[in-house]
Amino acid sequence: MDLFRGVNLYKKYINFTWKRHKVLLGNLANADTPNYKRRDLIFFLEPPTIPLKTTHNKHVKNFRKFEERLVVFKNGLQGNDRNNVSIERELSEIVKNKLAYETYLKFAMGSLNTLNRVIKGRAE
């Protein structure tokens, strides 16, 4: 039994949102760079090759692999300088990413607090 399985999954999401934040900031920094193409970091959850049986329809499926990919968008709105970065879109994505980061952090802290209470033998 892996007591930290949930925390480790949140750790992956927290690290992902941190890396994505840096990519989005790079887009903002290059908003005026000619021929710059916007980038984004996306992730995939690869399902297991053997389907797992769940006892409830709301159970989360087990995933084998968490994979990140850096995507370069070659299409989209482009100015005369062939740059496709929209400052408004990047700021919007940064805010959404920040909220995701904070949410994953709160979930991870909640899981750790629960484990701490269990270890100490308190059910508060």
Curated annotation (Swiss-Prot):
Q: Output the Gene Ontology cellular-component terms.
A: bacterial-type flagellum; bacterial-type flagellum basal body, rod
Keyword field contains Transcription: no
UniProt keyword terms in alphabetical order: Bacterial flagellum
**Segments crossing the lipid bilayer:** none
Q: What Gene Ontology terms for biological process does this UniProt record contain?
A: bacterial-type flagellum-dependent swarming motility
Signal sequence range: none
> Where in the cell is the protein located?
Bacterial flagellum basal body
- Is the keyword Isomerase in the record? no
Describe, as the record does, how this protein assembles with itself and its partners.
Answer: The basal body constitutes a major portion of the flagellar organelle and consists of a number of rings mounted on a central rod. In Gram-negative bacteria, at least four rings, L, P, S and M are present, whereas Gram-positive bacteria lack the L and P rings. The rod consists of about 26 subunits of FlgG in the distal portion, and FlgB, FlgC and FlgF build up the proximal portion of the rod with about 6 subunits each.
Q: Which family does it belong to?
A: Belongs to the flagella basal body rod proteins family.
In UniProt terms, what function does this protein have?
Structural component of flagellum, the bacterial motility apparatus. Part of the rod structure of flagellar basal body.
Q: What is this protein called?
A: Flagellar basal body rod protein FlgB
Q: Which organism is it from?
A: Aquifex aeolicus (strain VF5)
Q: What is the lineage of its organism?
A: Bacteria, Pseudomonadati, Aquificota, Aquificia, Aquificales
Q: Coding gene?
A: flgB
